[in-house]
Amino acid sequence: MAQDIDDIKDMMAKSQFKESKVAIDKYMSTPKNAENSDAWYLKGRIYNSLSYDNTTPESDVYNLRNEAFAAFQKYQQLDPKDLWMKLENFESYLNLYGGLYDLGAKFYNAKSYDASLNAFKKANEIKDFILSKKYEFNQVKLYPLDTALVLNAAVAAVQAKKMDEAIIFYRKLTDANVGGKDYEEVYEFLADHYSKKNDEASLM
């Protein structure tokens, strides 16, 4: 078993992600090590990498990416210089955003609608976090309202029979006056919903 963080880094470099996770979890179970900023960054990298491993059960992927996000945030709290994140230009966050977005679609296609909704919501949360920090990436530009992501979350919420959440997401689109053929169903859905509730004010 790895005894120090350099050993764990070596395991990670060899793509031994399962073993690396066991090792980093054991390493960080010691209170002193749990205050090591490098350990939190490494945990984030390990957990996110393991989430892409073909042998990882799909049911574990969401939690691994969720915990990776929390680990990167903890790293930044402990390292005022933000060295590792600056070296990678904060791309771990972008990777988590894209990974959770894709996971939401994957769960949706598998008819796991609750899991799909959770993944889309987490992707949106990470996107909002990235924008709040003003991180920018050469390969993609993120926007405050990711219309496709919000629509996907709304549709997943409908399928999961979580209508209150679906309405919240649909309203994000209509409140922003999003238009086009792809979004006609949004206005039709809300009109039908509020008509059934006799809520004329919300129809305006």
Predicted feature descriptions by range:
Residues 1-2, 194-204:
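Short, intrinsically disordered, charge-balanced linker/junction segments flanking boundaries
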Residues 3-64:
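Start-of-domain marker
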Residues 6-9, 35-54, 83-111, 117-122, ...:
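Amphipathic alpha-helical repeat scaffolds of TPR domains
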Residues 17, 58, 65, 113-114, ...:
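TPR-repeat structural position
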Residues 20, 68, 116, 166, ...:
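Single-residue signature of alpha-solenoid repeat helices
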Residues 27-35, 72-95, 126-144, 172-184:
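Short solvent-exposed coil/turn linkers within tandem alpha-helical repeat scaffolds
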Residues 128-129, 155-163, 167, 171-177:
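Generic signature of mature, soluble extracytoplasmic domains
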